[in-house]
A protein has these predicted regions:
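A noncatalytic interaction/capping subdomain that flanks phosphate/NTP-handling catalytic cores
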Residues: 1-164
């Protein structure tokens, strides 16, 4: 979402298209209404392995497959961490079954991936591609951490649970 505070920080163009707060809020309201009464899945996890820079993300979505995907991608909190989790730093709402109407919603297709950095809210609709959730989390981390003077890296590594190698 375009606001004066972030306008000059985003490379607006054919891919990153600005959306006004009023349009963002209208689509968000429609997505929330769409999700009412539906089975949803919620996952609370961490992005960023260094505790000094870790951000808490709450993922709310309608597809179990997408929830499983992000559950395997983000860092899962321990029982103790989950008990002390508190409020998420960012919330992602993914409603792939909700299709935007470009003529009414002011977007360019039935899908929309929108980030409101000031409200710490990400809305994804009209796309069943689970990677949009991942991309949104990483885009948020890239934006937020660079503001903190940190150059984020998009990488992962596996470790043997027995040998820790």
């Amino acid at each position: 979402m375009d606001t004066p505070a972030i306008h000059n920080d985003i490379a607006w163009g054919k891919v990153n298209r600005p959306i006004a707060k009023e349009r963002f809020d209208a689509i968000l309201a429609k997505v929330c209404a769409y999700l009412q009464g539906r089975e949803i899945f919620i996952f609370d996890g961490f992005a960023g392995a260094d505790p000094k820079y870790t951000k808490k993300f709450r993922i709310v979505n309608e597809l179990a497959s997408q929830n499983l995907f992000i559950r395997d991608l983000l860092i899962r909190p321990t029982t103790e961490e989950l008990a002390a989790y508190g409020e998420a730093d960012y919330t992602v709402i993914a409603a792939p079954g909700f299709k935007c109407d470009p003529a009414i919603d002011g977007v360019h297709s039935e899908a929309a991936i929108m980030i409101d950095y000031e409200a710490h809210l990400i809305v994804i609709c009209g796309s069943q591609y689970a990677g949009e959730i991942k991309k949104s989390v990483f885009s948020t981390m890239n934006y937020v951490l660079t503001k903190e003077g940190i150059l984020p890296m998009h990488c992962s590594a596996n470790m043997d649970p027995v040998t820790h190698e």
